[in-house]
Amino acid sequence: MTFFLFAKQLVDMLYQYQILDYIMVVLVFLLLIYQTALVRPNFRKRFMLTDGIIILLGLLLTVTFIRSGNGYQIYFKVMSAFLLYFVGRVYYDRIKECYGGLTLAAYFVIYINFFTRLCHFGFAFLKVQNAGGDLYYYDTDMAFAMILAMVFITMFGRNTVFKLVTVFVICPCMVFSSDAGIQMVLMIAVYAIMAIYFMELMSNQQRLAGIFLVMIISGLLGIIAVIYMPALGFDNSEFVISLFQGGFFNNDNMYSRYVDWKAVLDNCREQGLIARLFGSGMGADVIIQSLYIKIFYSLGYVGLGLSLMLIISIMYYVTRVEDRKTFYLAVIMAVLLLGSGVTVNSIESTQMSWFPLLFSGMVVSSVQVEKEKNRRGGRICLRL
């Protein structure tokens, strides 16, 4: 597991070598089989509602894949993300022992890309508006990797001057000197969430921290709602884009997204009832730069409903996890996956989906084990 967590961030950076992704999936299968055979969990006792929702989404996607007859790469990527959820379920305790590997890989990813950009642009790299993705395909992928690495270093790295420089100087320079608009918004949100976490640690004001956290998440949901208004026909795209004034989102890219989104939604409306309920296809030949619209296109209203149930179910367990670091880490992962999904089909990116689903599974198992320990403790007290 330590090797997997260390290698995953580096494999994402080496995206052009697709064979590495397949090797990682094989490794995940082997890890899952090994740990299941070693622990031999009671599946009937351990089965949770969240597990059932994941399985139903996988079955629904399989039916869509069989119906469409194409999109095997999409199917492979999404199913591998679901697989990572179950890896998190069985490795929940082992993952916490491997945070050092996550941190080391995070430093490698940040500074390899930083020196690559420095060699490419020189000391003018701060004026760069489009970095070309550095060692990633797009700036969005690069910025997501920087934020993810920054989170791992902040949460698990040793407190040093080097860590502070990395988190507060290098990472923001890499993200804000790029064309990754949505990731800039998410980076600000992640900084705010981490600030709330440290405020809670110092003041022990969990309720106040919860209020601030709700305010941030509500603000993000409001931004998402405003962005999608033109696609749903509630307002014109010129008005929404003018709100951002090109500060975070590239105007030309947003206009093209609105055109694509409306075309996809119009196509879905023209389909029959079965297609609207269960999806129109895998969308291998359609450009859909949105997680939410892609779910509707591929899985229909049923898939949207199941996805909403999955989010609610996972967040239910997140709010009940006792370890506050795990709680904030899970919240940040959810913000990154769902926030990136506004302008990127993040569930089909193994870089964006694997870690959030892995930690989701870990949280569900952690809460389940904590409940069992509390029950045993209660029984012992009654006997005494």
Predicted segments, located by residue:
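Long extracytoplasmic/lumenal interhelical loops at the membrane interface
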Residues: 247-302, 350
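Hydrophobic transmembrane helix bundles of membrane-integrated enzymes that assemble
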Residues: 1-238, 287-375, 381
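Charged/polar, solvent-exposed surface patches and flexible loops
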Residues: 242, 263-266, 270, 316-320
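Flexible juxtamembrane loops connecting transmembrane helices in multi-pass membrane enzymes
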Residues: 208-211, 223-262, 274-275, 282
